[in-house]
Amino acid sequence: SQTPSPLNAKMTSDMLGVTVNQLIKILSLLERSQLLRLLYYKTERNPKSMAKPQKVIFDNPSILYALGYANIGKVRETFLASMISNGHEAAYPKDGDLLVDNRYLFEVGGARKSFDQIKDIPDSFVAADDIEFGFGNKIPLWLFGFLY
């Protein structure tokens, strides 16, 4: 996958040799240390789904480069989440890449990214890399850097 995938807590905890609860605590501590960003579903009514993060990304895209892993999809999504989270609440949506303030839905991609995944969803936008100017609901990804 080109972008971060949903967290499989059971598989990850088994790989690390810890329980799921211990994994959640470790992830929470890494988030508090600002190394990771945990994204949760915000529309779920099931309290268990709120207990574990649905997606785990690095807090800052620079960490990806420092580790020598610079998948452009992950960098784009990490950048948007990092910039948006400065003053807004970011969550993991059922559709799209990022739900902001439980209202605005974003799909992240390159200049050719289409609205196919989020069409017919109100308040949805494409945050596109490699474009200088926005049009309609397509916003240049670099503009989100001004939110920081």
Where in this protein do the model-derived segments appear?
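Accessory nucleic acid-recognition modules appended to NTPase machines
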Residues: 1-94
